[in-house]
Amino acid sequence: MLLKHALAEYLLEIEIRKYTPKTIRSYRNNLNLFVRYLTEEAEIDEVEELTLAAVRRFSLYMVERGKKGTYINGLLKTAKSFIQYCYEEGYGGFNTKKNFRWCKEEKPVITAFQTVHVRLMLASCNGYGFLPIRDKAILSVLFETGIRCW
């Protein structure tokens, strides 16, 4: 079966499963990129020709284009779902529940407050009324536990 026909059926399937419109749009965009890579770069037109090596080459292709690990893993998650659907429907592909590798994601670095800034924030809660004491208590909890409010 042609990849574009399998893709159309898969998109119909996720609409039937009542995925949100935003999710469907995201899957459509991600899978169009994946299928375009397969047909133009890897010269794979049939689902039967799809292999794990082709998916890994797609991952490398995205890394070489400077994409971040989080973005690549989002694409791979969508591609994995599509390939598993094709496999279960008997169109071809492979079982993605084995040997599917993810891209390494960068861990975010959270910068800590400097002591001067902490003192200034606590000093801004001056007074003995309800609000200054409450604000100082909230800041103390946030600083002591490392909780981040975004």
Question: What are the functions of these language-model segments?
Answer:
Residues 1-150:
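Conserved catalytic core of the tyrosine transesterase superfamily
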